[in-house]
UniProtKB/Swiss-Prot annotation:
Signal peptide (UniProt feature, chain positions): 1-25
Name the UniProt record assigns to this protein: Adipokinetic hormone/corazonin-related peptide
Species, as recorded: Aedes aegypti (Yellowfever mosquito)
Pro-peptide region(s): 39-106
Modified residue annotations for Pyrrolidone carboxylic acid: Q26
GO biological process, one term: neuropeptide signaling pathway
Task performed by this protein: Neuropeptide with neuromodulator or neurotransmitter role that activates the adipokinetic hormone/corazonin-related peptide receptor (ACPR). May function in regulation of post-ecdysis activities. Does not activate the A.gambiae adipokinetic hormone (AKH) and corazonin (CRZ) receptors.
Length: 106
């Protein structure tokens, strides 16, 4: 029984030694809660870069949406003008029979 407990303790110590040899750490003391002088500057800067990218994407989406709305309005106006001209051509034909479109097709 003592032998198995001794082996278990030695195994635990061996695991701790191997685990600690594979990792490393550094403690940096500073006056306040800000990151120390050896902190990763890229990590602090990347959040600002992401915010700028998101602003650009948002502005681009807004511009595309505005242009699509403008294009839709132009298409609707052109369709309305086309329908009005077809109505006028039907009235000029007397309204009897089939409607004639501006290109002469039925």
């Amino acid at each position: 029984m003592r032998n198995s407990i001794y082996k278990l303790i030695m195994f635990a110590v061996l695991c701790m030694v191997l685990t600690s040899s594979l990792s490393y750490a550094q403690v940096t003391f500073s006056r306040d809660w800000n990151a120390g002088k050896r902190s990763l500057a890229e990590a602090a800067q990347s959040t600002g870069d992401c915010a700028a990218i998101w602003r650009s994407v948002t502005n681009l989406c807004a511009a595309v949406t505005k242009n699509i709305q403008h294009l839709t309005m132009c298409e609707a106006r052109a369709l309305m003008k086309n329908l009005q001209s077809e109505d006028a051509s039907m009235e000029n034909n007397g309204g009897g029979g089939l409607p004639l479109f501006s290109n002469g097709h039925l």
